[in-house]
Amino acid sequence: TWPEASEFCRAQGKRLPREAEWEKAARGDSGHLFPWGQQTPTPELAKFGQYLVHEIPIVAPVERGEADSSPYRLHHMAGNAAEWVEDWFGIDYYATMPDRNPRGPNSGRYKVVRGGSWKSEPVMLRTATRSGASPDRRAATIGFRCARSLH
């Protein structure tokens, strides 16, 4: 759940990244369509589109490769597990937020989830694609990464 992810990060002296931080970390300054560049996702670049019908999904480590890294050398920013971020979901986020240090709404019904998961279609792996989920949702498709401020 979002509260569990947030608490885990806080216990480590960190926090969930803000949505704008997550996107910049994924796309870099050059505006990549996907974390690794403009190339359409392939199984070598991301774990995605894996629908299981009569099997139970098993969580397992995913090997880190150089091909899937973002411009800031972060791995698995697309596919594998989608990721909770700090912000509440605002449908008009891109239209209403300032260009510098944007923040999501102060409250809402859903928290933002970024990056797509092992179950996602390729379009969900784009660096600008965003979705929302109820903060109390627990799913095998949603994980998180912690961030820390540099100053």
Each PLM stretch: what is its role?
Residues 1-131:
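Functional-site microenvironments in short loops/helix caps that host divalent-cation chemistry
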Residues 139-151:
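Short, structured beta-strand segments at or near domain termini in extracellular proteins/domains
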